[in-house]
Regions:
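A conserved C-terminal secondary-structure "cap"
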Residues: 265-290
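N-terminal active-site segment of His-dependent metallophosphoesterases
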Residues: 1-38, 173
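Cys-nucleophile CN-hydrolase/nitrilase-fold catalytic domain and related Cys-dependent amidase chemistry
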Residues: 17, 26-112, 178-205
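Short, glycine-anchored, charge-dense loop/turn motifs used at functional sites
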Residues: 6, 103-110, 240-247
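CN hydrolase (nitrilase-like) catalytic-core segments centered on the catalytic cysteine
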Residues: 66-84, 152-256
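Active-site catalytic loop in hydrolytic enzyme cores
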Residues: 63-66, 76, 92-198, 273-274
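Short beta-strand scaffold segments in enzyme catalytic cores
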Residues: 87-89, 100-103, 138, 237-239, ...
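Short glycine/proline- and charge-enriched loop/turn segments
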Residues: 53-61, 121, 222-227
């Protein structure tokens, strides 16, 4: 038996990165005290979701991985607590900017995953800020198991989850920043959850999604060309079992630490017994890569 205890942290985010990191630290320690060894924070939790507006000065938020304040802080936390912490950041690599997760394990930096699928509409203007990732779908060999990571919009694509599972992931994590959909005029929360529950079921793999909460408003100014915008992030973070069943679930408004334990050996055996990886026919799937 290989026991994995995972936590998904749901939190509101401040305009002040120091405040956000301090809050995230307290929630991570709450997860540690509940026995978690793999702890997921939301996407870009250092500050409010700046992608609501287009501002050239916000490019300055991006830093090289090891110069990022959240990475530096949580590298120490991971060493002190013996935990695995995927940290979502705005990365600068040379003159290229990415939406990135840095994987930290017990004081060690294991590498990065860069967001593959970049969304764009009036309220989620990520193409203005991020270049599509060039890392491929990464599975990290950590002290608690093989961990696959997708970032927010990646979670809507079944190819992400299948690629991670084929590459040996034993759990999939999705740091997220999602909420109201003013352009679509819909409440996407149920759709959002069911999408990842389906990925979990189809791959016989647990999934954890950590979302932010709260309403974040954009103030019109010259720097953003007088844009008006507001998003209410709907939380609803969750953890599924290997069949896609919700085993832990947060509400829409509360700061929450969800914790659940799995037997990875049991899950891996079940995946083999189902034969889903065995019975794949990659030679027949050309239509989806046109």
């Amino acid at each position: 038996m290989r026991k994995l205890t995972v936590a998904a942290v749901q939190m509101s985010c401040s305009v002040n990165p120091e405040e956000s990191i301090k809050k995230a630290d307290a929630l991570v320690m709450e997860a540690v005290n509940k026995g978690a060894k793999l702890i997921l924070l939301p996407e870009l939790f250092e500050r409010q979701y700046f992608c609501q507006e287009r501002r050239y000065d916000y490019y300055g938020f991006a830093k090289p991985v090891m110069e990022n304040e959240a990475v530096k802080h949580f590298l120490t936390v991971s060493k002190k607590t013996g935990t695995v912490l995927p940290i979502s950041i705005y990365e600068k690599d040379g003159n290229v900017l990415y939406n990135t997760v840095a994987m930290l394990d017990s004081g060690n930096f294991l590498g990065i995953y860069r967001k593959t699928h970049i969304p764009d509409d009036h309220f989620y203007q990520e193409k203005f800020y991020f270049t599509p990732g060039n890392t491929g779908f990464k599975v990290f060999d950590t002290s608690v198991g093989r961990v696959g990571v997708g970032i927010c919009w990646d979670q809507w694509f079944p190819e992400t989850a299948r690629s991670l599972t084929v590459n040996g992931a034993e759990i999939i994590l999705y740091p997220t920043a999602i909420g109201s959909e003013p352009v679509l005029n819909t409440d996407s929360c149920g759709h959002w959850r069911r999408t990842m529950q389906g990925h979990s079921a189809a791959n016989i793999i647990p999934v954890a999604a950590a979302n932010r909460i709260g309403t974040e408003n954009v103030t019109p100014c010259e720097a953003n060309n007088n844009q008006t915008s507001s998003l209410t992030f709907y939380g609803s973070s969750f953890i599924t079992d290997m069949t896609g069943e919700l085993v832990e679930s947060a509400d829409r408004t509360s700061e929450t630490v969800l914790v659940h334990s799995f037997d990875l050996d049991e899950i891996n055996a079940a995946r083999l017994e189902w034969g889903l990886m065995r019975d794949r026919r990659p030679e027949c799937y050309g239509d989806i890569v046109r």
